[in-house]
């Protein structure tokens, strides 16, 4: 019986040590200029906006939220191409539904079909996972975006910007996900 236990124990040890990870030799998909090149379609678009105003009350600046909005894209027929020479093009249409919630009054909902043509240059900073778009035509993609997810099939971007105009501040958070063709 002791020999049987010993053989079973040895068999178990051999079984465990002989198993290997099938993915051990697989190289990860690195964020690089070569790997990001390709044609993509939009899979998701979300834009959140907060509009605040500041007013001076007895020398103290008081912020006041004027309105918030949430915009969600849908029904995408949109091609986005990143070329190896650092240029990009984006064209097509999609439906965008926007819900604006003012500080006072009723919520306003709007749905429209947007047609976009956009082109320009891009610069990839793979070390910091950022991509910057400079548009020469259109303004669908403009500025620096954080790369949240990048793999063989998906590119997800996020941009948070703040626009000041006098006492009004617009905080805009844009998230876009693309699927590689």
Question: At which residue positions do the language-model features occur?
Answer:
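Positively charged n-region of N-terminal signal peptides that target proteins for export
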Residues: 1-6, 21
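Hydrophobic helical h-region of N-terminal Sec-dependent signal peptides
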Residues: 6-13
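C-terminal motif of bacterial Sec signal peptides marking the signal peptidase cleavage site
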Residues: 14-18
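Lipid interaction determinants
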Residues: 20-181
């Amino acid at each position: 019986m002791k020999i049987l236990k010993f053989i079973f124990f040895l068999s178990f040890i051999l079984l465990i040590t002989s198993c290997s990870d099938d993915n051990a030799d697989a190289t990860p998909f690195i964020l690089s200029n070569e790997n990001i090149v390709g044609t993509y379609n939009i899979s998701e678009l979300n834009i959140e906006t907060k509009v605040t105003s500041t007013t001076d009350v007895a020398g103290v600046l008081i912020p006041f939220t004027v309105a918030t909005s949430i915009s969600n894209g849908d029904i995408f027929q949109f091609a986005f191409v990143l070329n190896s020479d650092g240029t990009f093009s984006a064209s097509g249409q999609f439906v965008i539904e926007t819900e604006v919630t003012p500080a006072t009054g009723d919520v306003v909902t709007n749905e429209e079909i947007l047609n976009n043509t956009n082109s320009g240059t891009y610069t990839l900073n793979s070390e910091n996972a950022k991509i910057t778009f400079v548009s020469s035509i259109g303004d669908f993609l403009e500025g620096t975006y954080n790369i949240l997810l990048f793999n063989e099939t998906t590119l997800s971007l996020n941009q948070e910007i703040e626009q000041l105009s006098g006492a009004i501040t617009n905080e805009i958070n844009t998230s876009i996900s693309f699927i590689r063709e």
